[in-house]
């Protein structure tokens, strides 16, 4: 990636829009077959998922996990709170293929409100503050903390114990703070989580329609 500010929006595509209509038929059939997410207790701890949140059919949520209002965990994602706790705040989205785990008894994983976590991210025993965007394929390691309204670029590796100031653009392997975000870029972060809150509502409506249309079991 070049260092020029003008290249930032074009070069970093963290969250790609998708068409819900392309998946409607297949997903409706999947729901009618009774598919549900794997939501599993561990060590006496049961995941606590707000009724307005959405967990996709092929996602896995295990153990001491809390998921807040209008948040979402998408297809193939794994949220594993087995050896410590995980908290996902309100209006936060964990996209397809992401893995969230913890450090055994030392570092939980916390995603504050309005965080967007892109596809195939690994978050391990770290803390991501409010309004951040964690780009596709990136890794954030134990005891790292990402300051509010920051962007972790796609493919970045945030090393253990790294502290990222608020409103930072972080990129590279190992990740470094490239620069501070502009007011315009910070304002643009809202659109990512707002999109996913909308997707939650659409998917819930699709599932309700599919359930209503399904024939009653004998």
Predicted regions and their residues:
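Serine residues within intrinsically disordered or low-complexity segments
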Residues: 2, 13, 19-21
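N-terminal glycine-rich anion-binding loops that anchor highly charged ligand groups
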Residues: 62-68
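Short proline/glycine- and basic residue-enriched helix-capping loop/turn segments at helix->loop/beta transitions
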Residues: 116
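Short, Lys/Arg-enriched N-terminal segments with co-localized hydrophobic residues
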Residues: 17-37
